[in-house]
Regions:
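Non-catalytic, well-ordered alpha-helical scaffold segments
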Residues: 126-133, 160, 194, 198
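Helix-rich C-terminal "collar"/helical-bundle subdomain used as an assembly and partner-interaction module
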Residues: 147, 171-174, 187
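Minor-groove-contacting beta-hairpin "wing" of winged helix-turn-helix DNA-binding domains
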Residues: 180-190
Length: 207
């Protein structure tokens, strides 16, 4: 199992200072000293996908690859919005559509203070948003039948415009197949859609 992410450059870190210095060098027509350009990063990303595929690591989520049968069960449960309880200081949980986390203050945690912090009962809209933008991170996509079972409204009715737009742009595809309780439609991001997933997934957030 391999998780492959591009490095996020955060402010107030040595990498951020180096990246800023590289930007000045690039602007002057020079060769960066520290970090690759966006174009180089995309080539590295493409090469990573190809090398992993050659060695039997199939992509099952935007940034995760595994050999068959070795997908991370914890992560899959997270993307499918299954219940999970976080154990430990600062750990997050999702239980019966309520999100919360443990204290991140060591003194309080050592007193066995297990009071929920920042508890949020998710609205139906928030649940539908999470269903889409978490589920579409997986290459299996999202099931319209499961959406209906959970929310009692057709996925296509809620997200008609977003689906139409992304499919017309070649970022999303729909496939049909047999399910245990009848026919099912699954929506998946295309390879291009995965490459611009931040844009594609944002279409499923309610204004």
């Amino acid at each position: 199992h391999i998780s492959a992410y591009s490095l996020m450059i955060e402010k107030d870190t040595p990498f951020y200072e180096r990246y800023s210095e590289d930007e000045y060098i690039r602007a002057a027509g020079g060769k960066p000293k520290y970090l690759p350009s966006e174009e180089e990063e995309r080539r590295m990303y493409k090469l990573t996908k190809e090398l992993l595929a050659e060695h039997g690591y199939n992509r099952y989520e935007i940034s995760n690859y595994a050999r068959e049968g070795y997908e991370c069960k914890h992560n899959v449960g997270y993307w499918r919005r299954e219940n999970y309880i976080g154990m430990g200081i600062g750990a997050s949980s999702l239980f019966e559509n309520t999100r919360f986390h443990n204290t991140d203050i060591m003194f309080e945690y050592r007193k066995c203070n297990f009071e929920r912090e920042d508890e949020e009962v998710l609205t139906k809209k928030a649940q539908m948003e999470e269903f889409m933008f978490l589920g579409l991170r997986m290459t299996e996509g999202v099931s319209s039948r499961r959406f209906y079972r959970e929310f009692h409204i057709p996925l296509e009715e809620v997200y008609r415009e977003a689906l139409r737009k992304l499919m017309s742009e070649g970022l999303l595809v729909c496939g049909s197949g047999a399910a245990a309780d009848g026919e099912d439609s699954r929506y998946r991001l295309t390879e291009w859609g995965i490459d611009v997933s931040n844009y594609a997934l944002s279409e499923f957030l309610f204004a």
